[in-house]
From Swiss-Prot:
CDD domains: HFD_TAF11. InterPro entries: Histone-fold (IPR009072), TAF11-like (IPR045127), TAFII28_dom (IPR006809). Keywords: Acetylation, Nucleus, Transcription, Transcription regulation. Belongs to the TAF11 family. Pfam families: TAFII28. It comes from Homo sapiens. TBP and TAFII18 bind to distinct domains of TAFII28. Residues 35-45, 53-62 have a biased composition (Acidic residues). This is Transcription initiation factor TFIID subunit 11.
Amino acid sequence: MDDAHESPSDKGGETGESDETAAVPGDPGATDTDGIPEETDGDADVDLKEAAAEEGELESQDVSDLTTVEREDSSLLNPAAKKLKIDTKEKKEKKQKVDEDEIQKMQILVSSFSEEQLNRYEMYRRSAFPKAAIKRLIQSITGTSVSQNVVIAMSGISKVFVGEVVEEALDVCEKWGEMPPLQPKHMREAVRRLKSKGQIPNSKHKKIIFF
């Protein structure tokens, strides 16, 4: 009878222990802890790669911005550079055209020369003043030494001057009804005429009193 009448509390105690034991496998705390994923080394590498990729994109964007600015600056400078290039090209073409015209005119003129005129022209082309004599003359006048370029320039100018005087003297000789060779009187008259035309500067120094 005593066994049959066990108190409910004793049964309840055994039941409670069994419930607690059964509840251990399904403990929510243990389940939640196991369910949280832990960070691994692979995830850290992925984050570093993403950060590096973002930095690369920013750098490439900065480079593209700088390139755009440089292109804009060059586009602003291009019109002036193009204009200068076009002007230089036009001047070169114009000069080349003028040279071709001069050569053509000279060929026509030479083809119309008489034999005597052609001989005089050839002699004039081949003639030249001795550069050493020109250099000594310049140094005696200026009292200083001069470069070779100055000597060449003065030699060419002197040749042109003598050619103009001789040509004018031949015109004087023809006008006076005389025949060559040229005489001193022809040369003096040629120089006088060229001075009157203003083609020869006056060598006499004039003191200017009033300004």
